[in-house]
Amino acid sequence: GVQTCALPICLIDAEKVYDNGTRALKGVSFTVDDGEFVFLVGPSGSGKSTIIKLMTGEVVPTAGRVMVNGFSMSRIAEKQIPYMRRTIGVIFQDFRLIGNKTVRDNLALAMRAVGASPRELKNRIPYVLELVGLADKENSYPDQLSGGEQQRVAIARALVNNPSTIVADEPTGNLDPGRSLEIMTLLERINALGTTVIVVTHERGLVNHFNKRIILLNDGQVIGDGLGSYEV
């Protein structure tokens, strides 16, 4: 089969069996093109979170191939991992902000982790905060912000190293419907600026509102892939 893939995401017959014997993925194949916006949906336990972990390098496939921006996740060298991580920004449901650091410092930390210079920090941080509508919150602490604002900071942090791909894992799971719509609209805007966006969610109403490509998982397999609505 295909040995390399330069697209943002390629899964080729990806399987994942955890140490306890759970077969989380049973041969999953799909690709995501540059600049695409994709919803990854399915019931609890369908394999969505395993796919996220494969894309971020948290786990490696038991069989098959997972390629992220040209990096093969099953045989990536330790020293390549920081470079791979630069190409992909991750947004979590629970925000994962550092509580005793300001918004600016949360972003600065993510930039320093990949070796950005002070000048890059100075240019990039105001830009991403402006992009997510939080230009005036640079010196605020997470607990001074609403849930929706904290998720915007998490999105800014995912964007701060200018990744080509953003993966959002249930990004609206802790938000009310109004805020959820705002966050999805923001992700759509980021996608319109050229970033590939993959959103894992189970919120059917939101998915159907946006009319994007939907990859539907069930029991560790892809059972649907295309434009349309999320009906199970």
Where on the chain are the PLM-derived regions?
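A short, proline-enriched helix->beta-strand linker immediately N-terminal to the Walker B motif
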Residues: V160-S164
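Helix-to-loop junction immediately C-terminal to a conserved catalytic motif
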Residues: T56
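Conserved ABC ATPase signature
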Residues: Y141-L145, E149-Q151
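Catalytic Walker B motif of ABC-type/P-loop ATPase nucleotide-binding domains
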Residues: I166-D169
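Short coil-to-helix segment of the ABC ATPase nucleotide-binding domain corresponding to the Q-loop/switch region
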Residues: K101-L109
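Conserved ABC transporter NBD signature motif
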Residues: G64-S72
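ABC ATPase NBD coupling module
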Residues: D19, M73-G89, P118, I190-A192
